[in-house]
A protein has these predicted regions:
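Catalytic cores of enzymes
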Residues: 1-322
Length: 322
């Protein structure tokens, strides 16, 4: 758990039922807020056609500088204390950030020579209570996947149906709120190719946009499922409300509360082209089967090798859960 206050920053490391406190002297509360605000503006503008070339380049520099700061202020001291063994695959690490740190990609922190994904397979958890639920006995779940396309994501859906011809597809006018809520309990996995709205202040305004309205965080939390995985390939489905200091109430967490054991979500807006490329890379790993966290780790590694100097193209995807 990462704790940040006016008194300073600390990491609480829980390993083998032992708790270790690691001071984070370079983690300053005021600087963290300033960097978070700048980072959110940069990720919104780095690929925006309305921004000038100079503005997009400046946004790209801000993204890269934020990842370096995250490495130096948070990730490096945490990983130095943990000293994870070199292994293939790398060991798992669950990040439990608080405050403004919930909006930042801890899983992608790096200084150009060293980076978190080189050392561990990262997952996020909104609370320690949610983390405690991982690893509990599971019942068999239906393997048939559900694809919800309410964004005319033709390339993405074409890639998905080629990889998963058995999938149920709710597309266009058929992707209604009632149809989606009725279908979710009958499918072990769900892929949402939807637009999303995320309000940085008001949790209740966070929603996936469907054909006839919206699927809200409360809708997801009130309709329990027993399922393996939800993939939220929409804009900023993982970013929480900035006014919540102890818990990330967002669409991805709502899916966890609804019963999805793993959730893959985006922390900032991605384009439809990015989503299609991501789907083509992710799902072959999931077909093996590979645990979702490791499948995302492999997918991110491929994207990182393709776009080494453009972390906004490989770092938005985060895993929550088991």
């Amino acid at each position: 758990m990462l704790n940040l206050s006016q008194l300073g920053g600390h990491a609480l490391l829980l390993r083998d039922h032992r708790l270790t406190v690691v001071p984070l002297p370079r983690l300053d509360a005021r600087e963290a807020v300033e960097r978070c605000v700048a980072f959110l503006d940069a990720t919104a503008g780095v690929s925006a056609p309305a921004r000038t070339l100079d503005e997009r380049r400046a946004a790209g520099r801000t993204v890269r500088e934020t990842l370096v700061w995250l490495w130096e202020a948070v990730a490096a001291p945490v990983l130095e204390a943990l000293d994870p063994p070199r292994a293939d695959p790398p060991p798992r690490l669950w990040w439990c950030p608080t405050g403004v740190l919930t909006a930042l990609p801890l899983h992608a922190a790096g200084d150009g020579e060293r980076a978190v994904p080189d050392l561990v397979v990262s997952s996020h958890t909104p609370t320690l209570a949610a983390l405690a639920r991982t690893g509990q006995p599971q019942r068999p779940t239906p393997r048939r996947p559900l694809i919800v396309d309410a964004a005319n994501a033709h390339d993405e859906v074409a890639a998905l149906t080629e990889l998963m011809p058995e999938a149920t597809v709710l597309s266009g006018p058929a992707a209604t709120r009632a149809a989606v809520l009725a279908a979710l309990p009958r499918h072990g996995r769900a892929h949402f190719a939807c637009h999303a709205t995320v309000d940085p202040i008001h949790r209740e305004a966070n929603r996936l946009l469907l054909a006839d309205g919206a699927l809200t965080t409360d809708d997801l939390a009130r309709h329990p499922v027993d399922a393996d995985l939800a993939v939220l390939a929409a804009c900023a489905t993982g970013s929480g409300s900035l006014d919540l200091q102890d818990e990330a109430h967002h669409l991805a967490t709502a899916c966890q509360l609804a019963g999805y054991r793993s959730v893959i979500a985006t922390l900032w807006p991605v384009t439809t082209r990015q989503s299609a490329e991501f789907a083509r890379l992710l799902y072959p790993h999931l077909r093996h089967p590979t645990p979702p966290a490791l499948a995302l780790h492999h997918t991110t590694a491929t994207l990182r090798s393709r776009y080494p100097n453009s972390p906004w193209l490989w770092a938005p995807y985060a895993h929550l859960g088991e």
